[in-house]
Amino acid sequence: MRLKETIEAYRRNDPAARSGWEVFWLYNGLHATMYYRVAHWLYEHRLRFLGRWVSQFARRRTGIEIHPAAKIGRRLVIDHGTGIVIGETAEIGDDCLLYQNVTLGGTGMTNGKRHPTLGNNVMVGSGAKVLGPFKVGDNARIAANSVVLREVPPNATVVGVPGRVVRRNGEKLDHIHTPDPVRLELDALYARIEKLEEKLKEDQDVSL
């Protein structure tokens, strides 16, 4: 892991990070990924028990559980790192951002690929669950508390339970300013009511 570039990624994504030293000493998310790199190396070199031991030690220290077999790219940022779960066959690209209580989980008890693959520059908002062996495309945004159960195209924004795509223009969003799915449904309902009222008025004018 290139530690310096990862620390810089934290500083870019978190306005509260005042210095690189602060990130290095105080950020649980960074510590969890450092432990993961050690655990993953052990796991890849057939020292699987030791790899699992390191990952469980890291879970107790940081509150973040990353299976040592998971594949994680460069400059991963875990902000407010508590309650993160990253499963055994999960894959994460470069420059991704995860907030607290995110789960990259599997479905079922089958062998083989069970967990999601995140592309590059993917943001997953707090409390979101991404469950299953599918791809989340580059530059995708998943809103807080969404539950995503199927593939997400690149440059898309997903909200809701179950998650659905509401934007595909690649506009930069964060986990606070993603669209409210209830508001979107209400706006659509109001638009339908207005159309019905206009049609009703037209029908009344014709009958007169």
Q: Can you name each region flagged by the protein language model?
A:
Residues 168-172:
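A structural signal for small-residue-enriched, beta-sheet-centric alpha/beta enzyme cores
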